Design a protein with these regions (language model features):
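Membrane-embedded alpha-helical bundles that constitute the cytochrome b-like, heme-associated redox core
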Residues: 1-215
Length: 215
């Protein structure tokens, strides 16, 4: 296990940046569902059948999620014991509620991921590896909009993305500081972090509401 405080922060930062890259890719594919049903089906079919994605990248992603949460839990325990927030980015936004409640927002996001895996990943495993149903490259869009027929699910998804936005608002910029990026780039990183933290979660909310209203 990673022992030193600095090593834990760097590990937390790197795993967070890795998950941000995945989030950007996931959003890009999902957003195509509001533009083109055919394009969304093609991209989803590729991601769902490509061996590299299924048997290498997907396990790495799952490990990354678990690792990031475990590191966050360890940092939270260490911070509580020392009665100070060690994992912080000294700026106007980081000294707020956001930076003091990263663990809480992380718990909400983890709960959302549990529902998300149940909604999409578990049925996919059942479809391909338990029931051995025939390959249907056109099924992905219908499966997506079916999940967003439920207003309670849409509401929970939307609330979860609000917490994701708050989590990213602090974590994105903090990650670069933790890995030692020069202060010379701080303002640019902060601007990109805020834009990403607002626009991507808002985009996910838009996708959910769009399919609820048009499904």
């Amino acid at each position: 296990m990673i022992e030193s405080s600095i090593s834990r922060k760097v590990a937390m930062a790197l795993s967070g940046l890795f998950l941000i890259l995945f989030l950007a890719q996931h959003f890009t594919i999902n957003f195509t569902s509001v533009i083109s049903e055919d394009l969304f089906n093609k991209l989803s079919h590729f991601m769902g059948t490509n061996p590299l994605v299924q048997f290498i990248l997907q396990p790495i992603l799952i490990f990354g999620v678990i690792f990031h949460f475990v590191m966050g839990f360890i940092l939270e325990i260490k911070n509580r014991r020392s009665r100070k927030v060690n994992y912080s980015y000294q700026s106007g936004i980081s000294s707020s509620w956001i930076s003091r409640n990263m663990f809480f927002s992380g718990i909400v996001i983890l709960s959302f991921l549990g529902l998300h895996f149940y909604d999409f990943w578990v049925p996919e495993i059942k479809y391909k590896y338990i029931e051995f149903l025939p390959n249907d490259p056109e099924r992905y869009y219908e499966e997506l909009i079916h999940k967003f027929h439920n207003p309670t699910r849409v509401a929970f998804y939307s609330i979860s993305f609000v917490f994701l936005s708050l989590h990213l608002m602090h974590g994105f910029a903090s990650s670069f500081q933790s890995v030692g990026v020069n202060n010379k780039y701080s303002n640019t990183i902060k601007t990109i972090a805020i834009a990403f933290s607002v626009l991507v979660p808002l985009g996910f909310v838009f996708i959910a509401i769009f399919h609820y209203l048009n499904g």
